[in-house]
C-alpha cells in the first residue's frame, strides 16, 4: 500500500484511442492474463461511475449553436449573388454548382467546429456533449445533424443536390427539406442492403481462394525479401511502423559495421523505433510473397500472429483468417455507414490573406489571366511568385507557390485579412477523381446565336458539335418556333406578318396528309368565314382565284440548293371541290401549279412551262393504260371493237396528248427470288387468299407468275372467266377493248362499261377468255388554268404564247405500279410555251426564263421573266396581310419594281399577341425547315432618350409610336449564313443631303418625302446596296455605328450603339436609368431602340456547343456540354466496388490498364536483354513482384480511407494466390504443357530446369473467381460454382485430388489438416532445399530503376545457372 502512494496519478479524460494504447502497453508489460484482470477492474469502475452519474437524455438537452443564424444568412446572401451572376451569364452551371456546394459545405463545417467549444462554454455537463465527445455513443456528424444543420444531401445516383437542408433535426424540417432528406436516407438504405450482400459474397470468394493456405513449416529457406525504407519520405511513419511490426527480417541489419538485427529475427516495437531513430539502410523483410512453399506457408514468412504476439503456430489456417480479415470490414462498414447525404470530399482551398492594409505589387510577366473553378477572374502563376504589400511604414513579401490563383490586380489596394491568393489543395492520394459530363439544357425556345469566339465549322463534317477556343456567351433569342417537315410547303415568307388563324399556328404543319376539304378550309379560313358558313359548301372561287397566287406562292424543294443561287421552281397551291364519292381521298399538301424552269434557265420551243396534277386522274391500284388508235381488227366493225397494237409515240412517253384513255386495274406483287409462293401460275384464287407467308391477295382472279433475275412478279387479274365454244368469234382474239353492249355474249347486253378481253392459255390445247373491267377516263378541260393564273400571264406578249394541254404520263400498254398505298398520277395538265416564228425571229429556238423576287416595304413581288430576244413577259403578284388585297386580289403596277410608295396606314398596324413576324431559317437539313414567329411579347422598347436632360419633341415620338419588326431587320450579329433571301436594313442618318442621294431611285429624283430612315435591299453576302446602280456606294452594316443626336442635329452624342449588338442585363445605355432586360438591338430609331429579348448562357474553353448558328432551339434541347473533374464519394459503399475490381483484375478503371501496359513492356524488354531462357524467368519474377506491390497498395488505400487497419500480410496472402500462375504461350512448343494452359510459376521454373528446351510463358493476373476455379483440388472448385462442368472436366482428364485443403476434407467428411488435425500431415521434405533460387529483390520500386540495376540484383542467379550448365556439360563429356 505504501508503494501505491508513490505512483503518479493522471487526472486526464481518456477516449477510445487512448484506451487502445493503454491496453497495448499493458499486454507488452504484463501479458494477456494480467491485462484481462486489469481491464475487468476498469470496466467495473466505469459502470459504477455511470450509475452514479445517471445520465438522461431529453429534447431540451439539444442546444442549437447561437451563431447559426447569421452564418446561414451570410451563406444565403452569397448564394443569391451567385444566382444573379449565373442569370447574367457570368458563370456557367458547373461553376455555380461548385461554388454553391463549397459555400454550404464551409458553413456546415464551421458550425460543426463550433459545436464542441459551444458546449464546453455553455453547458459542459450536457448529456449529448458527454456521450458524443467522449466517444461513448454517437459521433460528431450525428450530433451535428441534431443541433447544427443537416447540410448537403445526395440524390439516389450519388450526385450532390445543391439545395442544402438548413434546419437540424431538433428544429424540424420543412416539407421540401424532408423530401430531400429522404433522398439521402433512401440511398443509405439501398446501399446498406445491396452492399452488405456484395461484401458477403466478396468474403466467400476470398476464403475460397486461400482456404488451403496453412502454416506447415517453420522455415522455407528463402533468401529473398522485400525492401522497405523510411528514407524516401513518401511513406508516413505510422504506415512504416504498421508494415514492420510482426514481420521477420530477411537479412542482417547493420549500423556502420555493427549488426543491430539478425536474419530471421522478428520485429517488435523497440526494434522499429531503433530503425526510425538510426535511419538505417533499406530493410529487407520476409513476406508471403517470398515464401518458396507452393501451396502452404512457413512461420517465418508469415511472422507474428496478431492474437498473442508470438510467431504463428504450426497448423494455423492463416488463409481463412486472411480472407475474413479483408471481407469482414466491408460488411461491418456497410452496416454502420451513417449517411449525411454523401461525403463531400472536395475540400476547400487554402487562402493567403493580406497581413495589413496596403498596395499590391508583383511582376505581371509571370502570371496569366484565367478563371478559377468558381468562375472568378484571377491570375495563374506557374512558378513561385513574390508579392509585395506596401503600406505607409513597411514592406511585406508574400511567397505564392506555383499553380496558385492570384485574386487581386497589380497596384490594387487591399485591406487587412483580405484574400489575395488561393492555393490549390494538393491532390489527395485517397480521393479518386473522375471526369464527368454535364449537359446544359435550354429552358426556353428561340434562335441560337453566338459570338465569333466559337468555331463556326463543326468538329465533324456532318455533325453539329462546335468547340470553344475561349470563354464566350451563347444567346437564345426569343421567339415562338414552329417546325415544318415539308420544305416545299411554307405559306409564309421571311418578314411576313401573320395572324393566329393562319395554318402555321393551327396545324403547326405537322400533318402531311388530310382531306381536300380540310386543306382548303385551312387555307381559306381567315378569308371565307363570312361567305361559307356550312362546312360542305364549296368556297367562292373568285376569292380562291384572287389569293391563290398572291398569298401562297412559295419555292419548292430544289430552291434550297444553296450553290445554285437561283430559284427554278414555284408552286401555286389551290384546291377545288371533289365529288362526294372521293371525298375521303387524301392528297399531299404539295398539290398545286408547279412552274418549273430548267436549271440553265433555257426553254426550247413547245416545252412544258408549268403543270398541274389533277386528282381526278389519280388511282391507287396498279394496272395498264390503253389509248384509242385508228387501227382495228377486220372481224369486228370499226366502231364496235378496238385492238391495240404497238403505236410509235411521237413524243416522250410521258407527254402523250389524248382525249380518252382506259385503265385496266390489276394487283401486282414484287417478291424476292427466294420467296415461297403458295399459288400456281394460271390458277384461279379468291379474295384474301394467302399468296406467301406474309402476303394475302386483295382481289380474286387469275394468277400470273413471272420469274425474273432476282425477283418474282406476281399479278392477279380480276374479271369474269368464260370457256367459249369454237363458234364465238370474239374468243379468237386477245387484248381487245369492247364498247358497252357490243359483244356477242347474252350476259353482256346489260353492261354499261367498256370491257377488256384477254386470252389465257394454261396448256397448249386448253384456253379460256378473261373479261376484265375497264375504267374509262375522259380528258376534259377540267379546271381551266386560265382561271387560276392571272390573265396577263396568258395574254400574248409579242410572240410568246402559253397554251394548256393535257398529257398522259404513261405509254400505251405500259404497266403502272403503285408502291404500298401511294397514288399514281395518270394525266398531267401542262402549260406549253411557244412563240410564233416571224421572219425576223426565225432563228430564235430558245427562250430564257427566270424568277425575280423583289421585296420593298414588306410587299413581296415575284417577277417571272421569259426573255425572247428583247421582249419580256412580266407577271407581278403582291403579298401581304389580307386587308392589303384589292377585290380581285391583284394589283398591277408599272412602277419601278424596286420602289414602293411609303404608306403609313399599311405599315403601322397594331400588334396583337397572336400576330408576329415570320423569319425563315434554312438549316443544313433540307428536309426540315423551321419558322420563328416574333410577336410584341418578345420585344420591348427603350426610350424616348433624353439628351442633356431635354426630351425630344412629342411630334417625333408620335410618328413612330408602334414597333414594326417586319420592316426593320434580318438576322443580325455576325456573318450571315442565309442565302436566297433579300433582307432590309434601315440606316439612320442625320445628313439630309445624303438621304436625298440615297432616295434617287432610278428616274424618281427627290419625289419622295425625306424620311429619318429608309430601307435598302440586302444581298446574300450581307452587303447593303441602294437600288440606284449609278452611284457605287456599298455599305457594310456590321461596321456602322449610329449616334443618337439631338433633334436639331447638334454635335453632342449621348450613346453609341450598333444594330445587332447584344446587351447584358443591367447595362446602362442611357442616362438616368438602367436597362433591365438582356437582348439584341433590332431597331435603332431616332429617339429609341427596340431590343429583342434574349437569354445569355456562358460557355468556357473545352466545352462543346450543340447546334448550328441561327438554328431553332426548343425547350429541353441540349445547348452545351461541359467536362469537369469531380471527386468521387469516399464512403465504403463506393470503395467496395473498387476493392472488387482490383481483386477480380477487371480493366474497368485505370488501375489495371496501367498495370497491364507496364507488364507487357517489361516482358518484351527483358527477353531482348537476357535472351529467351532467362528472359522468361526474370521477366516473370519482376512482373509478378511489381504487380503484387501495386495491388496491395490499391486495396489498402480504400480501407485506410475509411480508417480501417488491415495488416498487409492478409492482403499479401490473397494477392499471392491471384499472381502465382503463368500462361503457357504459343511462342515455343513444349511436350509437357499445352499452349494456353495455366500453371504455377514455381512448377514452370522447375520444369524449365529439368528440360533441355525452354518453356515460353508469360505472367497473367487471375481474378479471385478464376483463381478459385484453377486450383489443385477439383472437389474445392466444384463446391464453389459451375459444379457439373468442373466435375465432368475432371473426370474426362482423370484428375487426382490429394485432399490437401480444408474444404475438400469438409466435403468428404475427413479430418481437416489444421489445428489438432495437422499433426497427421506433418512430414519433412528435404528435396526443396536443393532447389534454391538465389534471387534477391531489394528495391521496392524496381520498375523505375535502370536496366543495369536489374542485372546487378540478379547477378547471383545468372552466375549460379551458368555454373550449373557448365557442370552438366562436363558430366556429359
Curated annotation (Swiss-Prot):
Zn(2+) binds at residues 220, 291, 298, 301. Its cofactor is Zn(2+). It catalyses: RNA(n) + a ribonucleoside 5'-triphosphate = RNA(n+1) + diphosphate. It is found in: Plastid, Chloroplast. Keywords: Chloroplast, DNA-directed RNA polymerase, Metal-binding, Nucleotidyltransferase, Plastid, Transcription, Transferase, Zinc. GO terms for cellular component: chloroplast; DNA-directed RNA polymerase complex; mitochondrion. Its main location: plastid. It is an enzyme of class 2 (transferase). GO terms for molecular function: DNA binding; DNA-directed RNA polymerase activity; zinc ion binding. It comes from the Eukaryota. CDD domains: RNAP_beta'_C (cd02655). Its EC number is 2.7.7.6. One of its GO terms (biological process) is DNA-templated transcription. It holds the Pfam family RNA_pol_Rpb1_4. Binds 1 Zn(2+) ion per subunit. The keyword Zinc applies. Belongs to the RNA polymerase beta' chain family. RpoC2 subfamily. PANTHER family: DNA-DIRECTED RNA POLYMERASE SUBUNIT BETA (PTHR34995:SF1). In plastids the minimal PEP RNA polymerase catalytic core is composed of four subunits: alpha, beta, beta', and beta''. When a (nuclear-encoded) sigma factor is associated with the core the holoenzyme is formed, which can initiate transcription. NCBIfam families: rpoC2_cyan. DNA-dependent RNA polymerase catalyzes the transcription of DNA into RNA using the four ribonucleoside triphosphates as substrates. This is DNA-directed RNA polymerase subunit beta''. The lineage of its organism: Eukaryota, Viridiplantae, Streptophyta, Embryophyta, Tracheophyta.
Amino acid at each position: 500500500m505504501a508503494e501505491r502512494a508513490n505512483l503518479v496519478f493522471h487526472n486526464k479524460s481518456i477516449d477510445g484511442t487512448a484506451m487502445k494504447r493503454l491496453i497495448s502497453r499493458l499486454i507488452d508489460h504484463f501479458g494477456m492474463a494480467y491485462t484481462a484482470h486489469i481491464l475487468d477492474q476498469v470496466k467495473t469502475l466505469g459502470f459504477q461511475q455511470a450509475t452514479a452519474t445517471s445520465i438522461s437524455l431529453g429534447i431540451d438537452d439539444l442546444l442549437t449553436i447561437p451563431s447559426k443564424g447569421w452564418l446561414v444568412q451570410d451563406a444565403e446572401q452569397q448564394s443569391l449573388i451567385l444566382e444573379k451572376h449565373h442569370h447574367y451569364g457570368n458563370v456557367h452551371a458547373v461553376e455555380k454548382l461548385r461554388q454553391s456546394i463549397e459555400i454550404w459545405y464551409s458553413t456546415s463545417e464551421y458550425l460543426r467546429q463550433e459545436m464542441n467549444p459551444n458546449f464546453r462554454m455553455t453547458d459542459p455537463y450536457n448529456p449529448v456533449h458527454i456521450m458524443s465527445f467522449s466517444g461513448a455513443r454517437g459521433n460528431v456528424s450525428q450530433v451535428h445533424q441534431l443541433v447544427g444543420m443537416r447540410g448537403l444531401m445526395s440524390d439516389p445516383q450519388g450526385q450532390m443536390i445543391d439545395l442544402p437542408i438548413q434546419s437540424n433535426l431538433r428544429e424540424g424540417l420543412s416539407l421540401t427539406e424532408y423530401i430531400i432528406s429522404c433522398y439521402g436516407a433512401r440511398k443509405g438504405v439501398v446501399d446498406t442492403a445491396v452492399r452488405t450482400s456484395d461484401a458477403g459474397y466478396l468474403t466467400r470468394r476470398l476464403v475460397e481462394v486461400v482456404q488451403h493456405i496453412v502454416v506447415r513449416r517453420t522455415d522455407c529457406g528463402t533468401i529473398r525479401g522485400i525492401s522497405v525504407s523510411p528514407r524516401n519520405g513518401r511513406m508516413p511513419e505510422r504506415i512504416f511502423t504498421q508494415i514492420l511490426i510482426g514481420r521477420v527480417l530477411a537479412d542482417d541489419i547493420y549500423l556502420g559495421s555493427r549488426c543491430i538485427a539478425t536474419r530471421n529475427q522478428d520485429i517488435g516495437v523497440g526494434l522499429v523505433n531503433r530503425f526510425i531513430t538510426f535511419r538505417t539502410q533499406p530493410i529487407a523483410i520476409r513476406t508471403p510473397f517470398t515464401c518458396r512453399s507452393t501451396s502452404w506457408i512457413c512461420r517465418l514468412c508469415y511472422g507474428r500472429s496478431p492474437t498473442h504476439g508470438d510467431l504463428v503456430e504450426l497448423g494455423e489456417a492463416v488463409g481463412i483468417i486472411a480472407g475474413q480479415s479483408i471481407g469482414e470490414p466491408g460488411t461491418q462498414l456497410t452496416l454502420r455507414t451513417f449517411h449525411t447525404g454523401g461525403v463531400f470530399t472536395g475540400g476547400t482551398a487554402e487562402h493567403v490573406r493580406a497581413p495589413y492594409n496596403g498596395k499590391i505589387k508583383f511582376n505581371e510577366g509571370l502570371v496569366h489571366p484565367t478563371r478559377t473553378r468558381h468562375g472568378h477572374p484571377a491570375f495563374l502563376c506557374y512558378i513561385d511568385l513574390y508579392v509585395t504589400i506596401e503600406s505607409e511604414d513597411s514592406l511585406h513579401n508574400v511567397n505564392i507557390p506555383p499553380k496558385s490563383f492570384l485574386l487581386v490586380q497589380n497596384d490594387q489596394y487591399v485591406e487587412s485579412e483580405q484574400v489575395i491568393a488561393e492555393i490549390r489543395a494538393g491532390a489527395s492520394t485517397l480521393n479518386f477523381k473522375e471526369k464527368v459530363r454535364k449537359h446544359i439544357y435550354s429552358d426556353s425556345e428561340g434562335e441560337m446565336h453566338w459570338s465569333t469566339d466559337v468555331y463556326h465549322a463543326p468538329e465533324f463534317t456532318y455533325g453539329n458539335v462546335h468547340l470553344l477556343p475561349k470563354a464566350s456567351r451563347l444567346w437564345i433569342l426569343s421567339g415562338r418556333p414552329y417546325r415544318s417537315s415539308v420544305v416545299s410547303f411554307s405559306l409564309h415568307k421571311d418578314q411576313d406578318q401573320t395572324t393566329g388563324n393562319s395554318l402555321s399556328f393551327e396545324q403547326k404543319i405537322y400533318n402531311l396528309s388530310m382531306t381536300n376539304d380540310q386543306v382548303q378550309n385551312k387555307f381559306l379560313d381567315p378569308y371565307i368565314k363570312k361567305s361559307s358558313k356550312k362546312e360542305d359548301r364549296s368556297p367562292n372561287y373568285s376569292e380562291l382565284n384572287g389569293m391563290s397566287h398572291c398569298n401562297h406562292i412559295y419555292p419548292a424543294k430544289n430552291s434550297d440548293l444553296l450553290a445554285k443561287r437561283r430559284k427554278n421552281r414555284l408552286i401555286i397551291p389551290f384546291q377545288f371541290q371533289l365529288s362526294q364519292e372521293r371525298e375521303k381521298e387524301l392528297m399531299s399538301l404539295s398539290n398545286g401549279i408547279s412552274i418549273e424552269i430548267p436549271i440553265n434557265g433555257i426553254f426550247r420551243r413547245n416545252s412544258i412551262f408549268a403543270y398541274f396534277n389533277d386528282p381526278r386522274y389519280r388511282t391507287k391500284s396498279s394496272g395498264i393504260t390503253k389509248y384509242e388508235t385508228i387501227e382495228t381488227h377486220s372481224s369486228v366493225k370499226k366502231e364496235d371493237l378496238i385492238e391495240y397494237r404497238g403505236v410509235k409515240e411521237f413524243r416522250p412517253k410521258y407527254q402523250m396528248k389524248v382525249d380518252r384513255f382506259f385503265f385496266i386495274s390489276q394487283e401486282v406483287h414484287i417478291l424476292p427470288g427466294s420467296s415461297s409462293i403458295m399459288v400456281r401460275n394460271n390458277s384461279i384464287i379468291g379474295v384474301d387468299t394467302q399468296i406467301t407467308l406474309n402476303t394475302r391477295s386483295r382481289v380474286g382472279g387469275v394468277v400470273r407468275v413471272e420469274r425474273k433475275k432476282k425477283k418474282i412478279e406476281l399479278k392477279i387479274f380480276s374479271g369474269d372467266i368464260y370457256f367459249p365454244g369454237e363458234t364465238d368469234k370474239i374468243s379468237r382474239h386477245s387484248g381487245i377493248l369492247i364498247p358497252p353492249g357490243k359483244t356477242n355474249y347474252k350476259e353482256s347486253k346489260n353492261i354499261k362499261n367498256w370491257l377488256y378481253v384477254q386470252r389465257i392459255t394454261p396448256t397448249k390445247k386448253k384456253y379460256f377468255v378473261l373479261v376484265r373491267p375497264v375504267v374509262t377516263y375522259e380528258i376534259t378541260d377540267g379546271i381551266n388554268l386560265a382561271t387560276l393564273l392571272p390573265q396577263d400571264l396568258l395574254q400574248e406578249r409579242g410572240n410568246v404564247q402559253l397554251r394548256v394541254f393535257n398529257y398522259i404520263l404513261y405509254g400505251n400498254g405500259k404497266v403502272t405500279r403503285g408502291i404500298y398505298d401511294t397514288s399514281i398520277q395518270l394525266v398531267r395538265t401542262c402549260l406549253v410555251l411557244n412563240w410564233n416564228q416571224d421572219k425576223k425571229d426565225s432563228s430564235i429556238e430558245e427562250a430564257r426564263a427566270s424568277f425575280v423576287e423583289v421585296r420593298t416595304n414588306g410587299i413581296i413581288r415575284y417577277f417571272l421573266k421569259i426573255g425572247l430576244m428583247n421582249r419580256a413577259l412580266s407577271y407581278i403578284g403582291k403579298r401581304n396581310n389580307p386587308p392589303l388585297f384589292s377585290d380581285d386580289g391583284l394589283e398591277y403596277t408599272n412602277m419601278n419594281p424596286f420602289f414602293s410608295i411609303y404608306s403609313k396606314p399599311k405599315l403601322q398596324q397594331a400588334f396583337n399577341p397572336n400576330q408576329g413576324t415570320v423569319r425563315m431559317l434554312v438549316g443544313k437539313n433540307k428536309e426540315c425547315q423551321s419558322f420563328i414567329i416574333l410577336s410584341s411579347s418578345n420585344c420591348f422598347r427603350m426610350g424616348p432618350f433624353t439628351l442633356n436632360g431635354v426630351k425630344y419633341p412629342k411630334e417625333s415620338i408620335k410618328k413612330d409610336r408602334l414597333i414594326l419588326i417586319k420592316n426593320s431587320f434580318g438576322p443580325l450579329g455576325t456573318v450571315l449564313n442565309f442565302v436566297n433571301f433579300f433582307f432590309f436594313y434601315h440606316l439612320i442618318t442625320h445628313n439630309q443631303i445624303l438621304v436625298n442621294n440615297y432616295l434617287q431611285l432610278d428616274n424618281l429624283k427627290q419625289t419622295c418625302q425625306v424620311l429619318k430612315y429608309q430601307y435598302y435591299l440586302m444581298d446574300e453576302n450581307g452587303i447593303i446596296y441602294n437600288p440606284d446602280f449609278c452611284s457605287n456606294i456599298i455599305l457594310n452594316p456590321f461596321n456602322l455605328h449610329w449616334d443618337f443626336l439631338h433633334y436639331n442635329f447638334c454635335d453632342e452624342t449621348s450613346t453609341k450603339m450598333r444594330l445587332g449588338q447584344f446587351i447584358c442585363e443591367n447595362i446602362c445605355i442611357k442616362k438616368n436609368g438602367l436597362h433591365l432586360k438582356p437582348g439584341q438591338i433590332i431597331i435603332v430609331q431616332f429617339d429609341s431602340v427596340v431590343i429583342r429579348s434574349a437569354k445569355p448562357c456562358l460557355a468556357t474553353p473545352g466545352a462543346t456547343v450543340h447546334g448550328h448558328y441561327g438554328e431553332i432551339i426548343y425547350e429541353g434541347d441540349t445547348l452545351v456540354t461541359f467536362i469537369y473533374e469531380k471527386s468521387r464519394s469516399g464512403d465504403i459503399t463506393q470503395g467496395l466496388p473498387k476493392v472488387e475490381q482490383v481483386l477480380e483484375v477487371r480493366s474497368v478503371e485505370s488501375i489495371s490498364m496501367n498495370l497491364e501496359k507496364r507488364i507487357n513492356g517489361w516482358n518484351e524488354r527483358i527477353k531482348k536483354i537476357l535472351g529467351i531462357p532467362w528472359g522468361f524467368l526474370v521477366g516473370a519474377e519482376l512482373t509478378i513482384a511489381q504487380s503484387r506491390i501495386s495491388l496491395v497498395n490499391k486495396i489498402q488505400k480504400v480501407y485506410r480511407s475509411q480508417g480501417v487497419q488491415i495488416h498487409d500480410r492478409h492482403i499479401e496472402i490473397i494477392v499471392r494466390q491471384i499472381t502465382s500462375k503463368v500462361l503457357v504461350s504459343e511462342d515455343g512448343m513444349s511436350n509437357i504443357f499445352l499452349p494456353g494452359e495455366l500453371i504455377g510459376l514455381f512448377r514452370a521454373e522447375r520444369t524449365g530446369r529439368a528440360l533441355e528446351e525452354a518453356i515460353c510463358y508469360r505472367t497473367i493476373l487471375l481474378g479471385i473467381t478464376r483463381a478459385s476455379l484453377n486450383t489443385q483440388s477439383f472437389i474445392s472448385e466444384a463446391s464453389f460454382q459451375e459444379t457439373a462442368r468442373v466435375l465432368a472436366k475432371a473426370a474426362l482428364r482423370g484428375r487426382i485430388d490429394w485432399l490437401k485443403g480444408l474444404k475438400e476434407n469438409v466435403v468428404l467428411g475427413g479430418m481437416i489438416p489444421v489445428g489438432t488435425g495437422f499433426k497427421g500431415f506433418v512430414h519433412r521434405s528435404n528435396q526443396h532445399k536443393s532447389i534454391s533460387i538465389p534471387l534477391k529483390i531489394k528495391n521496392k520500386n524496381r520498375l523505375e530503376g535502370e536496366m543495369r540495376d536489374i542485372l546487378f540484383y540478379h547477378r547471383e542467379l545468372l552466375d549460379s545457372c551458368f555454373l550449373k550448365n557448365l557442370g552438366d556439360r562436363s558430366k556429359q563429356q
